[in-house]
Design a protein with these regions (language model features):
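Core catalytic alpha/beta fold that binds nucleotide/phospho-ligands
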Residues: 1-121
Length: 121
């Protein structure tokens, strides 16, 4: 689980701009966030999801996991999910992770993400 300040994310994006966005978010995530009525909230929620994933995995952003190895997407019904690439995907395979569930919510100045992982039997 991760809680993030939307105002803090806004300050980071305004200060660092594309340099920060290109380091943390995939091109698809950046396009989606920029189209939202509240783009800073969208960036904040995706950032929280990546942090929550790394915490649920038990490693943080170590062992070579890059921010862009974790992509937040929405299925056709709007349900959020995570798509993994590179080292993040490799570590999940090594650990036998067979399912990842993501919940996102925001209210006022804060966004929260919760990630639950399933391990195969």
């Amino acid at each position: 689980m991760d809680l993030v300040s939307i105002r803090r994310m806004e300050k980071v994006v305004l200060t660092w701009g594309d340099r920060f966005i290109k380091r943390v978010f995939t091109d698809q995530e950046a396009r989606i966030c920029r189209r939202r009525p509240a783009p800073h909230a969208a960036f904040a929620l995706r950032f929280a999801a990546k942090e929550a994933f790394s915490k649920a995995l038990g490693l943080g952003m170590r062992r070579g996991i890059r921010w862009r190895d974790i992509e937040v997407f929405n299925d056709p019904s709007g349900k959020p999910g995570l798509r993994l690439f590179g080292v993040a995907a490799d570590i999940c395979r090594e650990k036998g992770i067979t399912g990842i569930h993501l919940s996102l919510s925001d209210d006022g100045d804060y966004g929260i993400a919760m990630v639950v992982m399933e391990r195969g039997a």
